[in-house]
Amino acid sequence: MPLTYRSTLTQFLIEERRRFPNASGDFNALILDVALACRAIARAVALGELGGAMGNHAAETGGSVNVQGETQKKLDVLSNEVFIRRTEWAGNLAGMASEEMELPYQIPQQYPRGKYMLVFDPLDGSSNIDVNVCVGSIFSVLRAPQDALDSGRDLNEADFLQAGRQQVAAGYAVYGPSTLLVLTVGNGVNGFTLDPNLGEFMLTHPKMQIPPETHEFAINASNSRFWQAPVKRYVDECLAGQTGPRGKDFNMRWIASMVAEAHRILMRGGVFMYPRDNKDPAKPGRLRLLYEANPVGMLMEQAGGRASTGELPMLDVQPTSLHQRIGLVFGSKNEVERIERYHAEPVQAEPSNPLFAERSLFRS
């Protein structure tokens, strides 16, 4: 096999840093620590049952749940610990927040504190672990408030409540047949494949772009009876295929891992929907804004796609709580804009179906 010379993640970050002559290097160091965490998690996922990390956490005592009320897998807890231990020590972070922790994580006193904050879902799609289907990690980097840096105080929840436009970087790792790290630092989206021989992430997918058109959509069809009118209209038109108003056939996908869905869309286009519905009116959506919707929203926009609540761009939403849930649609720009248009158009209620009485299902 001929040698192919590719940039490593380290080389890529150095090149990006040259755009900012006064940069300290702290940001690059943080991203490399995150990449190391992803490498460690990839190893644990690949070992599966051989590593003794399958099944529910604390199963012998009835199991454990996270702040979301979700049963924790052993790999959820392990992955969260890996993210913390690989990033807390270097003096790049002021604090962290995770899907698996109710409150912000404070950097221990024995370590210096930095100017960035890391928010993450350490293992997205963990319900797929036991059946050996793709899982991933997703993260976002924010700047810590200046007053926290000046005073050295601990971070509080309000410090993390920044709109997605304020993200410094976002990315995910997908643990599949190969391990890929997909990253944006605000200058496009680039994908890096883990070379198991070198132990390095190598640039394999430079300047990723999402096609504006698509023939694929992803939604959990088991919730169709709870959908409101705009999404039902969109899905019905897709399912009608070539003989319907869209005049072309669509394929429906569903992996139950947002990272895997986002990766497929970045690679070949598509649209993903996890809308607010009437299944549980107390929950304004399923996915979390700060460490799921916002990072994927930044990646989509940087790759020429779009991410939305259905009424406004996802990155413009002002968070109100650390674990806030929200309805989300993202992917190929033209399809997302079509769904937004359907939400903006008045919908006449159908007497036979009261679910269609409300206009929007992506409200935060």
Swiss-Prot record:
List, alphabetically, the GO terms of the cellular component aspect: cytosol
Positions with a binding annotation for Mg(2+) 1: E99, D121, L123
This protein's species is Albidiferax ferrireducens (strain ATCC BAA-621 / DSM 15236 / T118)
Per the record, what are the reactions this protein catalyses?
Answer: beta-D-fructose 1,6-bisphosphate + H2O = beta-D-fructose 6-phosphate + phosphate
Q: Which NCBIfam families match?
A: PRK09293.1-1, PRK09293.1-3, PRK09293.1-4
- Look up keyword Hydrolase and say if it applies: yes
Recorded protein name is Fructose-1,6-bisphosphatase class 1 1
Q: Which family does it belong to?
A: Belongs to the FBPase class 1 family.
Where would you say this protein principally sits, based on its record?
cytoplasm
> Which UniProt keywords are present, listed alphabetically?
Carbohydrate metabolism, Cytoplasm, Hydrolase, Magnesium, Metal-binding
